[in-house]
Amino acid sequence: MIGRKEKERERPYYRDPDDPEYIKDLQRPAVIKEDLSEMERRKRVQQILESKSFCHELEEVIRQECDTARTDPDHLQVLQKLSDLTVPQGNMSFGNLHTYGGNTIAIADLRGNEKYSKAERIQRNKLACLFRLADLFQWSQGIHNEISYRTNDEDNTFLMNPFGLLYHEITAATIVKIDENGKILDCGTLKAGVNQPAFLLHSAIYKAHPMVRCILHMHTAIVAAVASMKCGLLPLCKEAMVLGPVGYHDYQDIGDDDIQFDEIIANLGDKNVLFLRNQGFLVVGDTIEHATFLANNTVIACETQVRAARAGLDNLIIPEEKAIQRAFRNSRNTNSLKRNGTVDWRVGELEWESWMRVLDHANFQTGHVYRQPQLRPKSAMSTSMVNNNDVAVPPTTSAYGQIDETNLESVSAHRLALLRKEQERVRWMNSPNAYQKVEFLEYGADNPKKITKWVHDVNVPSASGTPVKISSVHQFSPASSNPKEFKEKQKAIKENNRLGTLSAGPQSQILDSVTYEDIALLIKPDNDGTVGQSSTADRAILIGTASKGIIDRQFQHHAQVYHQIYAPNPFSVETDADIKKYVDMVKAKNSQSAPVSARSGYSQYDEVEADTVSLMQGVREHKLSQAALSASDDGLNAGISPNNVRTSEESVNTSYMSQSVVFDCDHPSPMSISTEYPEKVKMTRFSSTQGTSEGNTTSRSCTTASEEEKPTKDEKKKKKKGFLSFMRKKDK
């Protein structure tokens, strides 16, 4: 036994003697240590005092202590100062009688008051719940209704509702405690009295029937209507049958001095329900649950009779006496109320527990001790933040910081964090306990590989498993015996950060078929000085992006790489001299294309300068320069003069850069620029070889045709619609 206890004992904390913090703490003077400890203590006290929950509890204690009968001057003075500082000033606010809305009055409000025993607390909570049910069922009529309960002590004391309060205002702390003579022993938190003449009737019944523990005296309208009938209550329904025999009494005002309680007691006899003619009814029960059960059935039976009486009393069907007696015996037979042989329910207890669940769901805080904890409302269940079960709580951070309750943003962020933690806990608790290994083949790749996944095993029931006893909080994560382990790990992390050895990890070769360093080697200039443009087909470089199957674990079996041809930057090898030469060329081309633009009715550029040149224009000029150079080389090789080549080049540049509409002689419709450009290059090369400029002739002939046709304004508008916005001529 001793060895088992030593095994379950927590491992002691080992202090590292070489720890710098520990050495500083030993060298620190005692005065400074005391100051630091006092600062920490005051900080903790300040945090508690600023807590809203602590202020709420303190206000409740002050309210209850102020209402006690203690008359010590010092005690009252201290309470007065505390109440001035904490308790908000203002009158007591009550909700509507039947519409509570969001401001509900708690039933079990006995907090921080130890003058009541545990048994009396339960009795007060239960009686206060009965008052709240009577209000919700609309049994009460104003303040002239009385419910009393005999306590379990030997002093023959009673609990009764304070006179002047409506039933929805009564709580466990406001109930008045009196003796058999009506003397107030505890006036509750509101210091209210009781209806003395009404309690005299209750006291007389308690003396005549020692087994009676609870009495209800109600003036419900529907019951008063049945009590005024000569026929009385008829056994028309099951609710009327379970009441058994009922008594009747010709009611007189209780305030009269000559009233005889013996007559009321005689009419009541051994019955549980007594109808007071033209006034209401009186219910006596062995327990609060029994009395509530009888009162509820009485009201329902009276409602049934009043509705059925519209057809006439002669037309009503009365059950046989045997059926009535059988229904009464079944309601009193406690053996028939057993559920699976585990719980013995007395009369009214099962219905009472269901009503308590209704009240707790409505956040009335009944304080009821449930006999069926599994049916207890979740809103009323107390949740503990301390849980030694490592399986119930998912792995997460265990540090808790202090929340500034005055900052709304921090409070809202804290609530969101708690919500996320609860969602993670639900996901963790609902995760399967049994898994099976499943392998998938990757598709979309040349060499597919196997992807292993662990999924829920549907063949194993969820309730199966081996229970494990949690004997220690470090059962699944044992504490280390080396006190220097944390410091060594911390120093190693700091050293790695200082050296800069951390990296993003290995570079993925799946995302890119070739790296940019390899591309730079592949696009080196040839022997003739050209870079990549003359041999694009031979140097097709594929780059690509991968699907989310490479990143997302759920799609590992469907990993694909999407390729595209690498397009280098056309200006990556250009120097400053080439760019300046290009700018001069653009200016020269604009000056040459000005007459053509004027004849065509539009212009492409407006004073193109080095700062205003667009990238698209530069790409076009770069392509034209390459085409012109190739045409010039072909012309020189064929023996053509440079003037003819220049004329051909000017025709190409004029027809392409000015973006003029080129018409074929047979087809007057305009042709697209993108499809026309390669054909013009071929025509230029062909004309250079033959010694003629067919492209120039075509351009001139088409231009002459356009001048001779002299299109109308509508045709000009149609032509302008086919060009880009920056190509149109600006209106001055």
UniProtKB/Swiss-Prot annotation:
Pfam family, any one: Aldolase_II
Segments of this protein annotated with the region Disordered: 1-22, 684-732
UniProt biased composition (Basic residues): 716-732
UniProt GO cellular component terms: cytoplasm; cytoskeleton; plasma membrane; postsynaptic density
Keyword Membrane carried by entry: yes
Topology of this chain in the membrane: Peripheral membrane protein
Location within or outside the cell: Cytoplasm, Cytoskeleton; Cell membrane
Record InterPro entries: Aldolase-II_Adducin_sf, Aldolase_II/adducin_N, Aldolase_II/adducin_N_sf
Gene Ontology MF terms: actin filament binding
Gene Ontology biological process terms, A to Z: actin filament bundle organization; barbed-end actin filament capping; long-term memory; memory; receptor localization to synapse; short-term memory
Alphabetic keyword roster: Actin-binding, Cell membrane, Cytoplasm, Cytoskeleton, Membrane
Biased composition (Polar residues): 685-705
Family stated for the protein in its record: Belongs to the aldolase class II family. Adducin subfamily.
PANTHER family associated with the record: ADDUCIN, PROTEIN HU-LI TAI SHAO
Function: Membrane-cytoskeleton-associated protein that promotes the assembly of the spectrin-actin network. Plays a role in time-dependent memmory loss and the retention of conditioned behavior over time.
Name of the molecule in the record: Adducin-related protein 1
